[in-house]
Amino acid sequence: MLLLISGSGITYFAFERFSMTHVFEMFTVSFLIWNSVRFYKNRNNTSGFLIPLSLLIAFLVRMSNFYVFLIPLIIKNLVKTRHRKKFSLLRNYYFIGSSIISTYFYTILSNKIYGKIIFNPQEVYGTNLSVDDVISNENSLLGLFIDIFRTSFKIFFGNEFGIFWISPIIFVGLFLILSDFKNLRKPFNLLLLMCFAQNFAIVYIWKSTAASYGFRYLYSLVPLCVLIYFQYKDKKINKYLLNYALIMSIFSNLSILFFETTEKTQLSTT
């Protein structure tokens, strides 16, 4: 697990871009997953109380990450499938009480910072661009598909921060889900695809070097992709893809090391 996480690009943000939110995104999403697993597996009331607080912090760190609200449902379906346990989060009094407290704190913080309660991140980021706007700018359906293909190719295999090279666990997580045709319609897989779809839509809308060609906005998916990796590792499916994740994680660590110690790179230490 340490190799997969270190090879996800975390060292780049932890040691060179620590002022950005991405390391905090990974922590909050991981914390949310951990609490969700503890609750649904052991009915841990402390975790039931911490789940709404985890959601609050994760949403405040990056308000465009709406998918975090799907994570408790993803874990619920995972635990239900693997351990045959059914615990209702919505009926847990600790969860209900914490949800009320978290909602109250969010309204206070939002009013203090923005002067009103905000749920639309576009109001924070100062943009009104949407997927519909991007699609309507294309002259034809063929042009739209070509543009999506070009963007996807750059996200996966771009020379700068292509996730195939720099964050193999994200690449593997997505393709493990897509290649599992037998279970593609199951709630666990569908919810995970929704998480990927939301982040990829954001990347498609804002195609720029400032977004590291999508890597920055996909990075918060790393904890979920690690979860996917171990879910399929137990099933012994796609061994070559799983081995690729381990090998390329080593390459990712080395590539970031060379990137940060080369004189002509943007964040060179010399």
Question: What label would you give each PLM region?
Answer:
Residues 2, 47-62, 69-74, 97-101, ...:
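Membrane-interface alpha helices of multi-pass inner-membrane proteins
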Residues 67-100, 172-184, 227:
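Perimembrane helix-loop-helix junctions
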Residues 13-23, 63, 111-116, 158-163, ...:
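Membrane-interface catalytic loops of GT-C/OST-like multi-pass glycosylation enzymes that act
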Residues 1-31, 35, 60, 65:
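Aromatic- and kink-enriched transmembrane "portal" helix at the membrane-lumen/periplasm boundary
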Residues 21-28, 61, 67, 166-171, ...:
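Hydrophobic/aromatic-rich transmembrane helices and adjacent perimembrane loops
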Residues 24-42, 47-55, 224-228:
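Specific aromatic-rich, kink-prone transmembrane helix
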Residues 1-5, 51-55, 100, 182-206:
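Transmembrane alpha-helix segments characteristic
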Residues 90-176, 191-203, 251-263:
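Membrane-lumen/periplasm interface segments of specific transmembrane helices
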